[in-house]
Design a protein with these regions (language model features):
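Extended, low-complexity cationic-aromatic segments
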Residues: 1-80, 177-183
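Short, aromatic/basic amphipathic alpha-helical patches
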Residues: 103-113
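Mobile genetic element proteins and their domesticated derivatives, centered on retroelements
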Residues: 17, 53-54, 60, 79, ...
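RNase H-like polynucleotidyl transferase catalytic core
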Residues: 37-45, 114-133, 147
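C-terminal anion-handling pockets and recognition modules
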Residues: 10-13, 131-183
Length: 183
């Protein structure tokens, strides 16, 4: 990553990861006045949607898009969106080793776009991926103990939170020499 930052001072460093959002609220502990037990409605369905997200680790901006599935084709589509959002800048994309992050379609995209470089995190190390921390914050803020009666408003609230909240993960400071963080 240090090499990328030196070669492309104006380049974008993104950490990418998909996640699944279920309509069923996840329960967490909360404080409540004595005698007033919080009520969280449940839904008997397993309605869900996936989000692809990429965090700009320098500036804390997250780019998130909902999708119906996690496949290599959807990964390629999301990467094409990233290339359109940053039309002139080199992009270093940090991602995990999920099966849908590999494949001939992805290889072709990389061959056709020399501005895009991929670096894979070590296996079974989700804590290294800053996007995982974004998912955690979004779930805590929107998904846990929610009282949405319909799925569409939950999806909208989740996507709005992701795209409008600045995230300070401290990734660059932790993994890149400080002299390069100022570039």
């Amino acid at each position: 990553m240090t090499d990328f930052v030196q070669r492309h001072p104006q380049g974008i460093v993104l950490a990418m990861d998909p996640m699944s959002l279920y309509f069923q609220a996840t329960l967490t502990r909360v404080w409540a006045p004595v005698g007033q037990t919080p009520v969280v409605r449940i839904t008997p369905t397993r309605d869900h949607i996936h989000f692809y997200g990429a965090l700009d680790v320098r500036h804390g901006r997250d780019i998130a898009l909902p999708t119906d599935e996690e496949t290599t084709a959807m990964t390629v589509n999301f990467l094409m969106v990233l290339l359109m959002l940053f039309p002139t800048q080199a992009i270093l994309l940090l991602l995990d080793r999920a099966p849908w992050h590999f494949g001939p379609e992805l290889d072709q995209l990389l061959t056709e776009n020399d501005r895009l470089e991929l670096v894979y995190f070590p296996p079974a190390c989700p804590e290294l991926n800053p996007q995982e921390h974004v998912w955690e914050q979004a779930r805590e803020a929107i998904g846990h103990n929610h009282d949405f009666r319909q799925f569409a408003p939950l999806i909208d609230a989740f996507e709005t939170y992701l795209n409008e909240t600045p995230f300070d993960i401290g990734f660059m400071e932790q993994y890149v020499p400080s002299i390069l963080c100022e570039v």
